[in-house]
């Protein structure tokens, strides 16, 4: 025991006299290990704490406080009691000691065994003995943390202090300037208010001590290590100011004053704070200030040039309206909402009669914001405004005026429809006839600019159940049909298609009886070739295409779906049978419509089941029939690359959201069809020969192409769906991938194989297949006839494994990098690096449930870019472009923040890529460089001369895309420091004269903007 005490004295002496700060950690470790107690530490400090020198006493208290910060959780209640008395006495000591006393008190404030009354005693001592704002920032922060800790654990005790606690804290905070401390102080004030601490007579003082920081004017220093932003302080202060209605009488005049100031940030902050306050205030708090608030908001919306301030002003007005709507009125009380809305109507309503004047839209926005506060506000405003707008529509004959009136009407009707659920009946009943008359008039007007807005209004009205009679709904559908089938205005047509898709969910029977027959008739009678208008120019959308888009758009209800899907499939069937002159583009359009229908069905299991069980067998039947019959008896149009490619997303979208039972059943049937020729799934089975899609060469060559449809189905299934006969299926796909069949067939087989490999569970099957695949690829790369097939399979398998982080992906990627030096395959392999790192539309994507690990691109970059750079450096001159192209493809898909750290090491290589004659390399490199140029001035400093020279040269490239992107890069350079650019200013301006006369408008546009920015370099205000 004596030995431990001696050791403790030694450590204390070394810390206090020897100035060895590390000894405090040794003392703390001794306390933790039970070698000595905290009270023994206090005893050993006796002579030190009684020393007449303040510096010596300070060192003693510092040692004790450091020990307590390490060991506070081990203290007993008795020890805490003794230490608190000790520290409270030390607060009366010399000011040098105060910071260390506060550190000790902070340690004690974190103890779980605080005796009753200690928190109150400590805070009273701090409030009385410490002049907080004379302390250093870190010591003031310690005081805030002591208060915070006690508020968390001793709330009821502190509340017993009454308003003295609030007054004490006001003294602590008064004059605080450091943003780190202010954040904590704001949180404390918010807790004081929201947890109902007594404010007593100090409400105004508490408000003043916080509101003096409003509005926040703080800009964090560059590279601020604390990460405190102006936004953090704004939100902290706003939470305080909006925490209680007791601040209202002081805050609202302040907000009005700041809204009327010239500072944009003050206006914005005031409006946002007002919106926050309205969630807490009631009519009583707002009553006196409503007139001033309305005047300020009105002025900002009427006069401001800032869209942000206008938006916040409108939001604040809506919040005021909502606040006034919430208050419960006594029978004899004034309805402030009513009088407030009357003022707004009085100031704004008359401007709606001037649709060509400047204030019409600000007035409409203000009225709509006020109406958006509640259903009561909405009915009040719309009841006053809509009759006026209806009257104005009839009084103005000019189309532009009428469009403005319609757009305002649309805004009010959208607001009104939001509150329908809260009302027993539609408040527009007395305006129904006038509204319908106006909208039907607009939708039949000769001016097409009215149609789009009128259709939106019709949609809002027709979506309100019971508002329009069935005869009116029929008329709406007739108008939609007419606009879809008209040949004059594509904008109206597309708006009608969009409106039809929305309304068909609510009124399916009207669309089935009135629109579908006309669409179907036009689909069948329109000539197969693309329609020409009277001037012989091809319109943007042929009638046939619009009919197809409309059929897809309205297929949002199961009853409509059962009508439209057979119509679309029948068109494909007629194309297959050669019943009329066939146009491939139209079949592709039908497939696009079927795909849209499938996507719309995905969230409704019943609709999806119908779609899946109808579309999948039909498409497979028709294509299998086409592939198994002679060209003399059947058209092969459905086996065209572009049509099969268009069918892939149709089948894929029908499979991604299937229920497990249906998915398993369909999988079994389709695998049996492709492996064994089992045609029981197919709706039509009059086939002249057996279906053998995996047989290579011979009469089954057309059948090989249908593997693309197998891919669409089987690679889109969720990963938990078991694939029967998977080993056998993979073996067949592997053989077909390396066979001498058509490019479309072996590419589809490779993609299907890769899609299955990506989802295949880890185990013997995957290991065996990958081993055989690697061997077959090696053999294929050696044999001349199959090299292209082998490299296609290699890239897809590599991608499948890269996505799932499979160990073999590295070996396969190395093989691809090695092939960049291959004289025959090098250029195509370089292009395939784009496929490795970019998203695939048909397989190996998230929609198809592929196994995709996060940040796979970053990992691929880290592992392989050094190898590409090394390969480039060692390659001969003819092969270098292949490495540059592969590198630019990889870099192009990475986020800027990943590329920036690597830019210094890669920049010289990227500049060399700009000199590569390959246009793909040039464009890819430029796209990669553009976002990086303004971010790395120090890196670019060395290369700026060569960079500008190369970019100016590329601005005259034969390829338009290269010219445009080069000009964008030259524009991006203007963000660099001025001293780097001024030496090149005249050279760039002269060189950009040529792109100004470019034959392409988009190039000229980019050149004008770029040259203007270079002209402005160095000018005042630039």
From Swiss-Prot:
User: Which top-level group of life is the source organism from?
Assistant: Eukaryota
Q: Which InterPro entries match?
A: ARM-like (IPR011989), ARM-type_fold (IPR016024), MMS19 (IPR039920), MMS19_C (IPR024687), MMS19_N (IPR029240)
Q: Which UniProt keywords apply?
A: Cytoplasm, Cytoskeleton, DNA damage, DNA repair, Nucleus, Repeat
Provide the Gene Ontology terms for cellular component.
Answer: cytoplasm; cytosolic [4Fe-4S] assembly targeting complex; MMXD complex; nucleus
Cellular localisation = Nucleus; Cytoplasm, Cytoskeleton, Spindle
Ranges occupied by HEAT repeats? 858-896, 900-938, 941-979, 982-1020
Q: Name one GO biological process term.
A: protein maturation
What family does the database annotate?
A: Belongs to the MET18/MMS19 family.
- Subunit structure, interactors included: Component of the CIA complex.
Question: What job does this protein perform?
Answer: Key component of the cytosolic iron-sulfur protein assembly (CIA) complex, a multiprotein complex that mediates the incorporation of iron-sulfur cluster into apoproteins specifically involved in DNA metabolism and genomic integrity. In the CIA complex, MMS19 acts as an adapter between early-acting CIA components and a subset of cellular target iron-sulfur proteins.
This one is known as MMS19 nucleotide excision repair protein homolog
What's the source species for this entry?
Xenopus laevis (African clawed frog)
């Amino acid at each position: 025991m004596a030995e431990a005490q001696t050791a403790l004295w030694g450590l204390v002496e070394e810390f206090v006299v020897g100035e060895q700060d590390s000894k405090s950690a040794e003392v703390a470790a001794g306390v933790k290990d039970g070698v000595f107690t905290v009270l023994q530490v206090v005893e050993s400090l006796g002579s030190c704490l009684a020393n007449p020198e303040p510096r010596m006493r300070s060192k003693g208290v510092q040692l004790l406080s450091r020990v307590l910060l390490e060991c506070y959780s081990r203290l007993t209640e008795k020890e805490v009691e003794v230490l608190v008395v000790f520290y409270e006495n030390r607060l009366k000591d010399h000011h040098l000691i105060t910071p260390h006393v506060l550190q000790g008190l902070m340690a004690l404030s974190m103890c779980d065994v605080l005796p009753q009354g200690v928190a109150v005693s400590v805070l009273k001592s701090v409030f009385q003995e410490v002049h907080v704002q004379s302390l250093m920032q870190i010591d003031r922060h310690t005081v805030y943390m002591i208060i915070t800790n006690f508020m968390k654990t001793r709330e009821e005790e502190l509340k017993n202090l009454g308003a003295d606690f609030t007054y004490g804290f006001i003294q602590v905070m008064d004059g605080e300037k450091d943003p780190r401390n202010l954040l904590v102080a704001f949180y404390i004030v918010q807790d004081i208010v929201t947890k109902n601490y007594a404010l007593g007579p100090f409400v105004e003082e508490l408000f003043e001590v916080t509101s003096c920081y409003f509005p926040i004017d703080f800009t964090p220093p560059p590279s601020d290590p604390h990460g405190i932003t102006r936004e953090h302080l704004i939100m902290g202060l706003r939470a305080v100011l909006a925490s209680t209605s007791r601040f209202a009488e002081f805050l609202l005049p302040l907000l009005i004053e700041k809204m009327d100031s010239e500072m944009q940030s003050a206006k914005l902050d005031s409006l946002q704070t007002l919106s926050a306050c309205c969630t807490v205030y009631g009519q009583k708090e707002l009553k006196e200030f409503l007139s001033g608030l309305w005047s300020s908001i009105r002025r900002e919306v009427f006069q401001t040039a800032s869209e942000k301030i206008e938006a916040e002003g409108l939001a604040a007005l809506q919040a005021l309206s909502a606040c006034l709507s919430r208050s419960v009125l006594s029978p004899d009380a004034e309805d402030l909402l009513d009088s407030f809305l009357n003022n707004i109507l009085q100031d704004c309503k008359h401007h709606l009669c001037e649709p060509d004047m400047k204030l019409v839209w600000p007035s409409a926005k203000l009225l709509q914001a006020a109406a958006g506060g509640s259903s009561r506000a909405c009915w009040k405003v719309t009841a006053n405004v809509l009759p006026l707008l209806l009257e104005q529509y009839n009084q103005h004959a000019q189309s532009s005026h009428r469009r403005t009136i319609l757009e305002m009407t649309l805004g009010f009707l959208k607001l009104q429809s939001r509150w329908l659920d809260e009302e027993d009946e539609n408040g527009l009943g007395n305006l129904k006839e006038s509204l319908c008359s106006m909208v039907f008039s607009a939708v039949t007007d000769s001016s097409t600019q009215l149609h789009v807005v009128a259709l939106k209004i019709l949609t809002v009205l027709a979506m309100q159940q019971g508002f329009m009679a069935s005869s009116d709904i029929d008329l709406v559908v007739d108008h939609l049909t007419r606009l879809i089938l008209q040949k004059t205005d594509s904008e109206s047509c597309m708006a009608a298609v969009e409106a039809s898709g929305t309304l068909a969910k609510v009124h399916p029977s009207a669309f089935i009886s009135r629109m579908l027959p006309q669409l179907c008739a036009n689909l069948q009678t329109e000539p197969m070739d693309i329609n020409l208008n009277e001037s012989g120019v091809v319109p943007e959308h042929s009638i046939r295409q619009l009919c197809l888009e409309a059929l897809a758009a309205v297929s949002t209800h199961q009853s409509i779906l059962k009508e439209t899907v057979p119509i679309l499939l029948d068109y494909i069937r007629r194309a297959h049978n050669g019943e009329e002159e066939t146009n491939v583009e139209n079949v592709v359009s039908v497939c696009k419509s079927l795909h849209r229908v499938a996507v719309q069905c995905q969230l409704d299991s019943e609709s999806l089941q119908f779609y899946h069980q109808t579309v999948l067998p039909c498409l497979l039947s028709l294509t299998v029939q086409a592939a198994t019959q002679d060209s003399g008896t059947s058209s092969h149009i459905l086996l065209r690359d572009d049509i099969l490619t268009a069918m892939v997303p149709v089948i894929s979208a029908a499979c991604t959201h299937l229920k497990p039972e249906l998915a398993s059943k369909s999988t079994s049937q389709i695998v049996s069809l492709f492996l064994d020729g089992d045609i029981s799934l197919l709706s039509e089975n009059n086939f002249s020969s057996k279906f053998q899609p995996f047989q290579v060469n011979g009469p089954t060559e057309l059948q090989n192409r249908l593997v693309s449809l197998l891919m669409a189905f089987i690679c889109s299934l969720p990963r938990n769906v078991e694939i029967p006969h998977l080993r056998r299926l993979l073996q067949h796909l592997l053989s077909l991938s390396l066979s001498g069949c058509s490019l479309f067939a072996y590419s589809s087989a490779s993609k299907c194989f890769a899609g299955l490999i990506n989802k295949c569970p880890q185990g013997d099957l995957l290991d065996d297949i990958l081993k055989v695949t690697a061997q077959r690829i090696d053999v294929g790369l050696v044999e001349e006839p199959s090299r292209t097939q082998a490299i296609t399979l290699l890239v897809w398998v590599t991608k499948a494994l890269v996505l799932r982080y499979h160990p073999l992906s590295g070996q396969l990627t190395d093989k691809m990098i090695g092939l960049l030096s291959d004289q025959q395959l090098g250029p195509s392999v370089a292009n395939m690096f784009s496929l490795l790192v970019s998203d695939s539309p048909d397989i190996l994507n998230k929609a198809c449930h592929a196994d995709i690990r996060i940040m796979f691109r970053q990992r691929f970059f880290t592992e392989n870019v050094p190898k590409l750079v090394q390969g480039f450096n060692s390659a001969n001159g003819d092969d270098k472009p292949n490495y540059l192209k592969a590198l630019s493809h990889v870099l192009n898909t990475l986020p800027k923040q990943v590329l920036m750290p690597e830019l210094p090491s890669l920049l010289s290589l990227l500049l060399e890529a700009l000199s590569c004659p390959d246009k793909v390399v040039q464009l890819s490199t430029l796209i990669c460089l553009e976002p990086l140029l303004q971010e790395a001035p120090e890196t670019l400093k060395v290369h700026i001369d060569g960079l500008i020279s190369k970019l100016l040269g590329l601005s005259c490239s034969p390829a338009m895309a290269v010219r445009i992107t080069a000009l964008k890069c030259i524009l991006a350079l203007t963000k660099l420091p001025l001293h780097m650019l001024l030496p090149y200013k005249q050279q760039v301006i002269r060189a950009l004269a040529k792109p100004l006369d470019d034959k392409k408008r988009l190039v000229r546009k980019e050149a004008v903007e770029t040259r203007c920015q270079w002209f402005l370099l160095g000018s005042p205000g630039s």
